[in-house]
UniProtKB/Swiss-Prot annotation:
It comes from Pan troglodytes. PANTHER family: DUAL SERINE/THREONINE AND TYROSINE PROTEIN KINASE (PTHR46392), DUAL SERINE_THREONINE AND TYROSINE PROTEIN KINASE (PTHR46392:SF1). This is Dual serine/threonine and tyrosine protein kinase. It is an enzyme of class 2 (transferase). Its main location: cytoplasm. Residues 1-22 are annotated as: Disordered. ATP binds at residues 659-667, 682. Residues 653-907 form the Protein kinase domain.
Length: 930
């Protein structure tokens, strides 16, 4: 309901009090408005981040569903049936928004700021509100004793007209007639501010008085005056408030010291909350502004100051007047001079900035963590795509070698096996006879008095003697045969098993089953145990021979089963064995089992290969999505969150003199930013989405790199949404500023020793990039910067990418580009090639183009010549070893280029030799260009 009082205008009216200047209100409005703008950007980034993770989850679930339902029509088997599901589950499920961080960030973007006024009593709280608004809106006369005070919670918010109403916080307005509704008023009537003692309505007691005003400050932030302690404890008020608001807490003081009750209240606030507090000593009504230099003021201030230090709100290292410090974290302030209420804008800025910086940092950590996972997975997927086919081929080759070796053994060792069987029989004969003599028959009742038994019992006894001889003989022959091929089993089977284990790594359970089955076949095939089953030719041969013995023995008369009889049966069975036939049979069976196992192995390997083929196809698809969609999209969000953090901490940099222009940006001088001096600022306006993504990934790689003395430092980034008068969005990259680039240095003239040291510095920088998995792809004169001591640093990582994230795009500077760059299939050896060209310039001491390149009329002409083998010419000043190093580096075959770990000591040796010899014999090989 509207009151009849005169409404405040859009411009706040400055009251007579010492704190109510329009300047302070403008500063507060500017600070809270800035917070709202940056909070909006944070909210937008969080919303897009949540959408990104939802899209990843949907993609994961969709792929899993299509895999389980057999979509796509791909060939499936035990190895590939659920391989796609396993692939996605293993590589996408770990990419998710951590619930704790998401909840924290969502709470921050949902909470708008408010100024909360606490104080020693209700009068001083009302007085501070009037000072803040610059108008006398609340009565400052005594509302009653502090113990009997019933001031309800007050909320001041923006509206086009002045309006006073009762409402439950965050719920609905109460229908209640207020005194303010009944006539004109200058200050809100005391009756409306207090909870009436005789009112038993719980809703009425909990309700807050909501005042809407047309006021500049309230357009940006609500102001809440806490109820008196007797009505509701401050801790409870804060607890309700922090769920929906970010409180900027002010504490109004009017006494020279804190009472015991004040200290208890502040201790509880500090115990349950971590918010800083702005303590302000409100001047007494009607008093003049007290000279801050008086000793009385100093002593009073120091008493409050000491109390707040004891309570942990202030630190002895911070000046209590509220002057802003260098800390990024907001600190509590004590302002005892009423004319310095303007420091509230500094305090609120610190509180709001701390909140935003912490949130931006937390969000950026989520981005960077998931981005690193993407990049690591890209490496794993790329390696999987490269190594799995090689492993399968290696497994097939090694198994075939093992099969042929064992087959050769079976073919050529028949005579050896015959001799081995004869030797084994001779060695074991007595042992076998003794074992047969002492043998206890199963399922045959032998009369103890030596009476003859029937033919059936005789046959059973002879069969058991036969089985004993066969089992013992088989075991002995097998042991000797195994020892003859054991070295093959160790060298081949062990290697094969290790290779199979690598093939099953990171695969689904179904692939594990296939690989385990394959290993079982492998062990069964090559663990050479020569056992003769009842259907084998060896057993049939032995059985025929022993049947003849039975016929000779049994058809005369049924014998008595005595020790002598058992020995005689065993003797005749052993003597009737043919070693040559037995050897031939063993080798034949060995070959049969080898063939069978070899075929089973090959079939199972084909099955595994089919499973891997389907899996690798899915891996390649996922690898492409990671490189072209997931990682760039997340990198852009990461760039935005990090740039928000940087602009909050260090503000937007000021552009100085233009230093140079490149293909995608302009480089400016920047005197000072973020504590770094001097700086270079590269302003990049990405023309399209692809360039945005490339820039974002470049920024991530640069920020992820540890600092290195051979790389130019990147200090930070800021996104300028109003670049060029608001016509475009630019990314401002703030970097270390160096003296000049190598191109300029060579034109000015550098000594031989300096040039060779620069070459060593460049190699060291490239080696570091390669050690981090990165490929620069654009090593050239202008991308090597020199400091004042002419030590080199590599810059412009615009084309720099991890090998696994390279799409095969043609990038770089034509004369420094390796031939394989044009095919789209290349690795970090392209940097070795580019260094070879750079080294040509370094050794020449000039920036003049090589003749082979200078004759080219166009880039296409140059590229065609490079592909056909055109290289820089040898200059007369070149040292032989330098020329050989150049030629090796720019070799057309990437595999023949030297590793930089070999190039570096070679360069050091060249430098030691030439520079030492130059001091004695000038101009020996290379000009000393000065």
């Amino acid at each position: 309901m509207e009151g009849d009082g005169v409404p405040w205008g859009s411009e706040p009216v400055s009251g007579p009090g010492p704190g109510g200047g329009g300047g302070m209100i403008r500063e507060l409005c500017r600070g809270f408005g800035r917070y709202r703008r940056y909070l909006g950007r944070l909210r937008q980034n969080l919303r897009e981040t949540q959408k990104f993770f939802r899209d990843i989850k949907c993609s994961h679930n969709h792929t899993c569903l299509s895999s389980l339902t057999g979509g796509g029509g791909a060939e499936r088997g035990p190895a590939g049936d659920v391989a796609e599901t396993g692939l996605q589950a293993g590589q996408l499920s770990c990419i998710s928004f951590p619930p704790k961080e998401e909840k924290y960030l969502q709470q921050i973007v949902d909470c708008l700021p408010c100024i909360l006024i606490l104080g020693q009593d209700c009068n001083v709280k009302c007085q501070l509100l009037n000072l803040l608004l610059g108008v006398q809106v609340l009565p400052t006369t005594k509302l009653g004793s502090e113990e009997s005070c019933k001031l309800r919670r007050l909320r001041f918010t923006y509206g086009t007209q002045t309006r006073v109403s009762l409402a439950l916080p965050g719920q609905y307005e109460l229908v209640h007639t207020l005194v303010a509704h009944q006539g004109n008023w200058e200050t809100i009537p005391e009756e409306d501010l207090e909870v009436q003692e005789n009112n038993e309505d719980a809703a009425h007691v909990l309700a807050e008085l909501e005042v809407t005003m047309h006021h500049a400050l309230l357009q940006e932030v609500d102001v809440v005056v806490a109820p008196c302690q007797g009505l509701r404890p401050t801790v409870d008020v804060l607890g309700d408030l922090v769920n929906d608001f970010l409180p900027v807490i002010t504490y109004a003081l009017h006494k020279d010291e804190l009472s015991e009750r004040d200290e208890q209240e502040l201790q509880e606030i500090r115990k349950y909350f971590s918010f800083p507090v702005f303590f302000f000593k409100v001047p007494k009504l009607g008093s003049e502004i007290i000279d801050s230099s008086t000793k009385r003021m100093e002593s009073e201030r120091s008493l409050l100051y000491r109390q707040l230090i004891d309570l942990g709100y202030l630190s002895s290292s911070h000046w209590n007047c509220g002057a802003p410090g260098q800390d990024t974290k907001a600190q509590s302030m004590l302002v005892e001079q009423s004319e310095k209420l303007r420091h509230l804008s500094t305090f609120s800025h610190q509180v709001l900035q701390t909140r935003l910086v912490d949130a931006a940092k937390a969000l950026n950590l989520v981005h960077c963590h998931c981005l690193d996972i993407f990049i690591n997975q890209a490496f794993d997927m790329q390696r999987d795509l490269q190594i799995t086919p090689k492993r399968l081929e290696y497994t097939r080759k090694k198994e075939n070698e093992l099969y042929e070796s064992l087959m050769n053994i079976a073919n050529r060792k028949q005579e050896e096996m015959k001799d081995m069987i004869v030797e084994t029989l001779n060695t074991m004969k007595e042992e076998l006879l003794d074992d047969a003599t002492n043998m206890e028959f199963k399922d045959v009742i032998v009369p103890e008095n030596g009476e003859p038994v029937g033919t059936r019992e005789i046959k059973c006894c002879i069969r058991q003697i036969q089985e004993l001889i066969i089992s013992r003989l088989n075991q002995a022959v097998a042991n000797k045969l195994i020892s003859s091929v054991d070295y093959l089993r160790e060298s081949f089977v062990g290697t094969l098993e290790r290779c199979l284990q690598s093939l099953e790594k990171s695969q689904d359970v179904s692939v594990h089953i296939t690989s385990n089955y394959l290993k079982q076949i492998l062990n069964a095939a090559y663990h050479v145990e020569v056992t003769f089953h009842s259907g084998s030719s060896v057993t049939r041969m032995l059985w025929e021979q022993i049947k003849q013995i039975i016929q000779r023995i049994t058809w005369v008369s049924p014998p008595a089963i005595t020790l002598e009889w058992k020995r005689k049966v065993a003797q005749e069975a052993i003597e009737s064995l043919s070693a040559s036939k037995l050897a031939k049979s063993i080798c034949s069976q060995f070959r049969t089992r080898l063939n069978s196992s070899h075929e089973a192995f090959a079939a199972s390997l084909r099955q595994l290969e089919a499973g891997h083929s389907g899996r690798l196809e899915k891996t390649e698809d996922l690898w492409l999505r990671v490189r072209k969609d997931h990682a760039p999209r997340l990198a852009r969000l990461s760039l935005e969150s990090r740039s928000l953090q940087d602009v909050l901490l260090h503000r937007k940099p000021k552009l100085g003199q233009e230093l140079g222009r490149g293909q995608y940006g302009v480089v400016y001088l920047c005197d000072n930013w973020g504590g770094h001096f001097p700086c270079a600022l590269k302003s990049v306006v990405p023309p399209d989405e692809k360039h945005w993504n490339d820039l974002a990934l470049e920024f991530h790689y640069m920020r992820s790199l540890p600092k290195h003395e051979r790389l130019v430092d990147l200090h930070g980034s800021v996104i300028d949404y109003n670049y060029g008068g608001g016509s475009s969005i630019a990314v401002l990259l703030i970097m270390e500023r160096l003296h000049r680039d190598l191109y300029t240095g060579l034109k000015a003239g550098l000594t031989l020793e300096t040039r060779l040291q620069i070459a060593l510095d460049v190699v060291e920088g490239i080696r570091f990039l390669h050690s981090q998995g990165l490929v620069h792809r654009d090593i050239k004169l202008k991308n090597v910067l020199l400091d004042k001591q002419n030590r080199a640093k590599i810059t412009d990582l615009g084309f720099c990418k991890p090998e696994a994230m390279m799409s095969g795009s043609i990038v770089g500077t034509p004369i420094h580009m390796a031939p394989e760059l044009f095919t789209g299939k290349y690795d970090n050896s392209v940097d070795v090639y580019a260094f070879g060209i750079l080294f040509w310039y370094i050794c020449s001491g000039s920036v003049k183009l090589p003749e082979a390149f200078e004759r080219c009329a166009s880039k296409d002409h140059l590229w065609n010549n490079v592909r056909r083998g055109a290289r820089p010419e040898r200059l007369p000043v070149f040292d032989e070893e330098c020329w050989q190093l150049m030629e090796a580096c720019w070799d057309g075959d990437p595999l023949k280029r030297p590793l930089l770990g070999i190039v570096q000591p070679m360069l050091q040796g060249i430098m030691d030799r030439l520079c030492k010899s130059n001091s004695e014999q000038p101009n020996r090989g290379l000009d000393d260009s000065t």
